[in-house]
């Protein structure tokens, strides 16, 4: 049994390779097959193209023509995070859910945020600087507002990665605690059966949370993109 309640977040190894690597490689391999290159799209690729053109537009209803070329990237990030989130829920946590690790969520969110902001400053430098001073700000408060807006700007990637990792970590801890309770109380049906029912309901809820967190992450990326383009 795991010695520590946080032990589940330390990746297991297979042939000296962390299971996180296998999890990400498995999920990334799906992205290779959903983009047709020079050959006719397969049935699965056709389904993916339909998802990207219809479902993505329904999720991001305010997509502007300027951000439309980024739909493929946003959809790819959504599918990647969704697959990793869902795989990390299945016991015995063989895939060790990389998205519950802050280092990976920051590694995924920070480059996207940085690229979007660099593009925004490149395309409209003066417009981006004007966002540091809200309209109608008194002259005496302009230096303070510049500092506040700058700090809020650099807090975006921190919140982006922390929100995803914190929500998934909380869900994994609850599942771990309930599964441990079921194991320890398995000799008493009067206690273990209600806990098992709660565990199943929580597991279904966590699948929904995994989907919602993938949506929230990509929705924020889309929001930052709209602010800069």
UniProtKB/Swiss-Prot annotation:
Gene3D superfamilies listed in its UniProt record: ATP synthase, F0 complex, subunit A
Record's protein name: ATP synthase subunit a
Transmembrane portions of the chain: 14-34, 70-90, 105-125, 140-160, 164-184, 189-209
GO MF, any single term: proton transmembrane transporter activity
One CC-aspect GO term: mitochondrial inner membrane
Pfam families in the record: ATP-synt_A
NCBIfam families assigned to the protein according to its UniProt record, in alphabetical order: ATP_synt_6_or_A (TIGR01131)
Gene (name only): ATP6
Mode of membrane association: Multi-pass membrane protein
Assigned keywords, A-Z: ATP synthesis, CF(0), Hydrogen ion transport, Ion transport, Membrane, Mitochondrion, Mitochondrion inner membrane, Transmembrane, Transmembrane helix, Transport
Function: Mitochondrial membrane ATP synthase (F(1)F(0) ATP synthase or Complex V) produces ATP from ADP in the presence of a proton gradient across the membrane which is generated by electron transport complexes of the respiratory chain. F-type ATPases consist of two structural domains, F(1) - containing the extramembraneous catalytic core and F(0) - containing the membrane proton channel, linked together by a central stalk and a peripheral stalk. During catalysis, ATP synthesis in the catalytic domain of F(1) is coupled via a rotary mechanism of the central stalk subunits to proton translocation.
Cell location: Mitochondrion inner membrane
Keyword Nucleotide-binding: no
Biological source species: Strongylocentrotus purpuratus (Purple sea urchin)
Residue stretches in coiled coil: none
Disulfide bridges in this chain: none
Subunit description: F-type ATPases have 2 components, CF(1) - the catalytic core - and CF(0) - the membrane proton channel. CF(1) has five subunits: alpha(3), beta(3), gamma(1), delta(1), epsilon(1). CF(0) has three main subunits: a, b and c.
């Amino acid at each position: 049994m795991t010695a520590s309640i946080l032990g589940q977040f330390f990746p297991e190894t297979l042939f000296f390779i962390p299971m996180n690597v296998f999890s990400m490689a498995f999920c990334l391999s799906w992205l290779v097959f959903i983009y047709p290159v020079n050959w006719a799209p397969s049935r699965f690729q056709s389904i993916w193209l339909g998802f990207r053109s219809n479902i993505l537009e329904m999720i991001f209803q305010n997509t502007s023509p300027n951000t439309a070329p980024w739909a493929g990237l946003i959809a790819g990030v959504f599918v990647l995070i969704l697959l990793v989130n869902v795989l990390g829920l299945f016991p015995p946590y063989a895939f060790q859910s990389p998205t519950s690790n802050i280092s990976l969520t920051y590694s995924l969110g920070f480059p996207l945020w940085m690229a979007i902001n660099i593009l925004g400053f490149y395309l409209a430098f003066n417009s981006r600087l004007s966002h540091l001073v809200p309209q109608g700000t008194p002259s005496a408060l302009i230096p303070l507002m510049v500092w506040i807006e700058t700090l809020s700007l650099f807090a975006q990637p921190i919140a982006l990665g922390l929100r995803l990792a914190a929500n998934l970590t909380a869900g994994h801890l609850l599942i771990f605690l309930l599964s441990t309770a079921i194991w320890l109380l398995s000799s008493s049906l009067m206690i273990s059966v209600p806990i098992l029912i709660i565990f199943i309901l929580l597991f279904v809820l966590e699948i929904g949370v995994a989907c919602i967190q993938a949506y929230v992450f990509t929705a924020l990326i889309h929001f930052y993109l709209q602010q800069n383009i």
